[in-house]
Structures are given as C-alpha cells and as structure tokens.
C-alpha cells in the first residue's frame, strides 16, 4: 500500500497518533479476550475491522487481508501492519462522508452513476482536467493513475488516498 498521508509520517516512518494507537490496542485486546486468543488471523481481518473498528463496508471492500501477513507465517496478522492499516482505515472512515461527496461530484461530472465500485481511467481523468479548464500536465494525470504497480485506474479507495495526500481530510483523531 502506498504511503497515504505525509503528516502521519516522520523521518520516513509511520507514526500512529497516541489516541488512535490506544483505540487500536483496546480493540485488539477486546477481540483477543472475546475470542480467547493472542493472535488475529488473516481470515478474521475483515470481520474484525467491521465489528471492532466499525469500518464501513464501503471501505472494507478495498481491505486486502494479505497486506497484514506476518513474515514467516501464512495466517497471522503482523501487529505493526495492523496499526498502520488500522490507522489508515480509521482516518478514511471518519472522513467517509467527505470522500463520498467528492467521489459523487467527480462521477456526476463524468455523467456516471455514483458508486464506490466505479473506477476512473486515464481518459476519465483527462476529461475531468479539461472540464475544469486546467492545464494539468499529463505526468500529473499519469501519477494519479499509478498508485499501485501497473494499475491503470483510480478506484474509490485510491481517490480517498489522493484526498489525504492533498490535505483534504481531517487527520485529527479524537
């Protein structure tokens, strides 16, 4: 997963705000107590994020459990990865209304039905830039489409990350 929000990183390393870390630790502890376990397994990541972190189904759709695998295992969640991904999803979840409103505006301007399952392609982004009457360099448009590997589209989750990168999301955790 790409580095989403530079404000949450110091010296190239991710720093989880203390209140958020406390919330994530409490959720993990409660899960372990409720399930008589010391580990969170990959197969339980999505249900855990839904029940214990209260992450919206719209965001859970984009959660990739394999991003959590502890090196040397095939089914145990790496706790540091949990803190990073959990923090990211909590921030996106608390900003979900703003993300949805902006996504809807973008899709409406393209004449498309608003849906979190829609994708924007390179021509879509070019059309948006033209409709905004912007002289957006092609490299900027291409950068928006290369968030992960060779993927040539922007989905709802990528769009949320872009909003975070440009400072449009509330990064405070209460």
Question: What residue ranges belong to the model's regions?
Answer:
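Strongly charged, low-complexity linkers/loops
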Residues: 105-148
């Amino acid at each position: 997963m790409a580095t989403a929000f530079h404000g949450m990183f110091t010296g190239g390393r991710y720093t989880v705000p203390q209140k958020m870390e406390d919330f994530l630790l409490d959720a993990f502890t409660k899960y372990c107590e409720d399930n008589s376990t010391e580990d969170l397994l990959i197969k339980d990541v999505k249900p855990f994020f839904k029940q214990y972190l209260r992450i919206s189904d719209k965001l859970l759709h984009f959660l990739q459990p394999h991003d959590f695998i502890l090196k040397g295992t095939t089914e145990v969640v790496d706790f540091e990865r949990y803190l990073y991904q959990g923090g990211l999803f909590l921030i996106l979840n608390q900003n979900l209304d703003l993300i949805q409103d902006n996504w809807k505006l973008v899709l409406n301007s393209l004449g498309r039905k608003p849906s979190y399952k829609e994708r924007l392609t390179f021509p879509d982004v070019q059309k948006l830039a033209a409709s905004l009457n912007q002289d957006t360099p092609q490299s900027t448009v291409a950068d928006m489409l290369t968030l992960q590997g060779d993927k040539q589209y922007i989905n709802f989750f990528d769009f949320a990350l872009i909003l975070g990168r440009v400072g449009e999301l509330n990064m405070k955790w209460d």
